[in-house]
Every structure is written in C-alpha cells, then in structure tokens.
C-alpha cells in the first residue's frame, strides 16, 4: 500500500506539469472561438440587435455592441492570458445571460434534464470561461509574466 501511495503521489506530481500547457491550449482554442463569435456579431450588428429585440433584452443595440465587443476583446485577452480571471468572470457571466435569455429552458432543466443543458450552445463557452476563472491562465501567459515581475502569486 505504501508503494502504491508513493507511485500515485509521483504520478500526480508529474501530471501537474501539464496544467499550464493544458490551460494554454484551452485559452488559445476558446479565446479564438470567442474572437470569432464576437467578430461575427460585430459584422452583423443589425441582425444581433434584432435577435436581442426578439428576446426582449433591454437596450438591444447597446447590448449587441457590448456583447460583440466583450466576446471579441475578451477572446483576445484569453489568447494572450492577460487579466484572465477577470475576463473569465465577464465571459462566464455573458454565457449565463445567454442561457437565461436564449436557452432558458436548457438552463432551468439543469438538474431535471442535464443533457439539454450540456448540448446548448453556451455550454462549452461557459465551461471554458469557468476553467480560466477558477484555474487562472497558467505559466504561459501575460498574467504570469506580470506576477513574476511584481513577485506575487497568480
């Protein structure tokens, strides 16, 4: 049993080296996805405004510009790993609002029918945002460079 615990501890230590490369991959992929969705919204702002109007979102034109900018610039910030936790928070909130307004049925069926929640469009974006919010950007990020420069832990 002692050997098994030692091997487990050793394996866990080695696997922990994958944390930063994994977070980099998450940030690069999902950051790019956010950039693309934001860019698409920016170039179809009248459609997005109309869609927001159909969902009874207040100030639809303002919110169309706000959401498209948040997704585009938030995606860029994720890619470079700057202000990652704050960006993750804003993007996660954005995805929760997307659930609430566009996929409300999926959101309220979280416990009764989780499959509906998981297959809704905002899910993977929400999950990636929460990962960055909770785990941070990792070592391969501007956040880590700033933290080293300021001698603080991220």
Give the role of each language-model region.
Residues 1-43, 61-69, 73-154:
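Extended, low-polarity transmembrane helix blocks
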Residues 46-58, 85:
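Short juxtamembrane and helix-loop transition motifs at transmembrane-helix boundaries
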């Amino acid at each position: 049993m002692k050997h098994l615990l030692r091997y487990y501890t050793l394996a866990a230590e080695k696997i922990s080296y994958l944390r930063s490369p994994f977070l980099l991959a998450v940030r690069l992929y999902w950051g790019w996805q956010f950039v693309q969705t934001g860019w698409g919204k920016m170039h179809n702002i009248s459609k997005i405004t109309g869609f927001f109007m159909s969902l009874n979102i207040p100030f639809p034109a303002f919110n169309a510009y706000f959401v498209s900018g948040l997704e585009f610039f938030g995606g860029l910030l994720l890619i470079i790993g700057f202000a990652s936790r704050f960006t993750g928070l804003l993007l996660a909130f954005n995805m929760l609002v997307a659930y609430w307004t566009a996929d409300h049925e999926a959101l309220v069926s979280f416990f009764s029918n989780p499959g509906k929640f998981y297959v809704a469009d905002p899910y993977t974006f929400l999950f990636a945002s929460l990962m960055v919010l909770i785990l941070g950007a990792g070592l391969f990020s501007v956040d880590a460079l700033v933290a080293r420069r300021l001698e603080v832990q991220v």
